[in-house]
Amino acid sequence: PLKAALLAEKAGAQGITIHLREDRRHIQDDDVRVVQKGINTKLNLEMAPTQEMVDLALEIQPYQVSLVPEKRQEITTERGLDVCSQEKALSKIREKMQDKGVLFSLFIDPDLAQVDASQRIQADSIEINTGKYTELKSPKEIERELERIQKSAKRAAEKGLKVFAG
């Protein structure tokens, strides 16, 4: 993983994102440590909001953590976090990260209630899930989903959140 990260940096990447899954199918804990120490740019650690992952992030102290939901069977992250139903728990994680100087981001579906909840818990940024948009075929459905993404991005920016999409 470090060789790939360094190659990406050499090609102009301004940051490296790695997703440490609970089942460790892509990378291992030590890979995260090696990449964090070996890169020259910023490390964004994508992870599930579990105590095990929080502990590792607090040890490593990446530039940013991005919390994502995780199901063992999925190939890639399929949906956004339900921030509305987890505000208290996510707020505690946010506080721990920000106390260590780690930026805190949430991967959410394009939904205004989720944007508002992300702002209430004082996230630094959100990443809007564009997965559904990429899978739609009907022009009408595509337009509707794009509108949801745009409205969510606008609301987040108005609330002072940095916005990413992916």
PLM region spans:
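Histidine/lysine/aspartate-rich catalytic loop segments that bind and position anionic ligands
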Residues: L103-R155, K159
